[in-house]
Amino acid sequence: MHATRPTLYGTRHAVSAGHYLAAAAGFAVLEAGGNAIDAGCAMGIALGVTLPDFVNVAGVAPILIRKADGTVETIAGLGHWPRSIPADLFMREHGGRIPNGVLRTVVPAAPDAWITALERHGTMSFGEVAGAAIRYARDGFAVYGILADNIREREADYARYPGSAPIFLPGGRRPEVGETFVQADLARTLQHM
């Protein structure tokens, strides 16, 4: 049986991510002398920028690290709901669904997970590994088909929130495939971190 994609070979490093710019960020970190943890964190942060409809920098980032001796370390990277939220609230009041809005929000855990991984096993600082993600957010990247489709499907939701509308509906309209998608506030936040 033949694979639908070609087998790729290399002699120095290999990375894989859900967006080619995130993979480029990880590869650049490895080329600069970083290790796999540095590259993984760089890719995770970049995915929060390049896949904003799937991944969120202020979301979750569970991390599994397999060490050279074969042991595995986990960094939970999972956010929590406030203690005041009853465990059965979503079943009782929302039919088992988590509604849009503040009830969907957990305490952001991804930044802590990345920083913890870098402190324990990395060779680079958060600022060094976040450089590409900051650049992608600040300067933008080309809108791709899935992002354009997801923005179209969620247009009404984005329009409801004054913090989301200028990002996902710049100038009051959906960005088209190939247009530049900029997240200046996210770039400033990552730069501050």
What are these regions (language model features)?
Residues 1-24, 28, 36-193:
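Noncatalytic scaffold domains of N-terminal-nucleophile
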